[in-house]
């Protein structure tokens, strides 16, 4: 049988998905399985790593069954994962010693406070491109080693293994033959030097993480090891591509050249700009991260996150009951010519890049007796575009690269009003692809490159198909007036504490 399909595994925060992708980059079939969220205390979020593994086995079986494709026809497996989520397991038995601590979880705040107190901020920033925050994996590993009896000692003896979710899945799929991660995931741990491309002794000492438990860091596109036959219907299939979800989306969007950027409009927004083979150190509170490593060289990215995006539209629907379903927001916003001076600052959990203000709260400005729900809905959608411009402007300042176009994906990218306004407020075209599953495509493309389904990035580029290009329609003067109003609104919200 000809091996012409790639199986892409997308291990997310609330569910696991498997997709089969053909040589044309088309999705042939999908299977999805949700799993439980564990909330031991307020602000803590954990997953059962064995349940995640069970969900992966279920979706692999499900998608092969659904598509009637044999395991013999799979040329390779690509993995993309929720980043930063951390597992520590027993090397012999393969059992996790504690739940996986999820990227959203704030349970390591005390460890972070101590690191700040000890003056490690500049060291961490200069070596990892990251900030001290419970978000990243290193403090999660420290927390597990602190809270499980005997764990530190066992880790030092080499009896325990650490990994982000990609590492855990590769280890399980290969029957323990490969304990690895890729550059993109390693760069989110607080332990990896993104300039020297190695686990950093000073950082390991800082968190007292034994080197013996760390995975080997490998390129994002490479044959790492084969599946054990009993996990893949009797077949040994190469696991050949890995990238964290946002980096995978950048790759799946075909953002291969320096200066190309993508925005994923999910619950929040994740913006990444490819900065090429040079790491750009941010002066604006953005993260410097590894995008991927292929063919012996690595590329870097700048990353900015917006905390509230799609969740602002959910707030209109569930909190304020202004719309029945999220997609109605487009219709309401399009009925009027403008928001009539109304601004919504959706700082429900503070503001992310480039403000990094965790104390500011949501606010609405410019209401008059004539304000109706259309203006309110439109202003809420516009806030997503303003925040995106804030981050992209910071990226341009840091990198010295002018953005030419923005590629978009994620749920809210289907909103035509929002995408048009995004183009207008940025002053550059916005491109939405036909296939919105860019994260999965990224993982598939990385694996396919390693096993020869696609020859090179140029061939992959041909499989990126445009759904709609939104051209700039707004005059410069109007754009700057609106954006100035947004900044006034943010400043006023920040003053109200």
UniProtKB/Swiss-Prot annotation:
Activity control: Activated by phosphorylation and inhibited by fructose 1,6-bisphosphate (FBP).
Entry annotated with the keyword Transferase: yes
Annotated ADP binding sites: 13, 17, 267, 310, 411, 415
Any single GO CC term annotated in Swiss-Prot or TrEMBL for this entry: cytosol
Residue spans crossing the bilayer: none
Residues binding ATP: 13-15, 267, 310, 314, 411
Modifications the protein undergoes after translation, according to the UniProt entry: The phosphoenolpyruvate-dependent sugar phosphotransferase system (PTS), including enzyme I, and histidine-containing protein (HPr) are required for the phosphorylation, which leads to the activation of the enzyme.
GO MF annotations in UniProt: ATP binding; glycerol kinase activity
Pfam families, A to Z: FGGY_C, FGGY_N
Entry-linked PROSITE patterns: FGGY_KINASES_2
Enzyme class, UniProt record, top EC level: transferase
Reactions that this protein is recorded to catalyse: glycerol + ATP = sn-glycerol 3-phosphate + ADP + H(+)
Binding-site residues, sn-glycerol 3-phosphate: 13, 83-84, 135, 245
Functional pathway: Polyol metabolism; glycerol degradation via glycerol kinase pathway; sn-glycerol 3-phosphate from glycerol: step 1/1
Family: Belongs to the FGGY kinase family.
Described purpose of this protein according to its UniProt entry: Key enzyme in the regulation of glycerol uptake and metabolism. Catalyzes the phosphorylation of glycerol to yield sn-glycerol 3-phosphate.
Quaternary structure, from the entry: Homotetramer and homodimer (in equilibrium).
Name of the molecule in the record: Glycerol kinase
Species of the source: Listeria monocytogenes serotype 4a (strain HCC23)
Chain's gene name: glpK
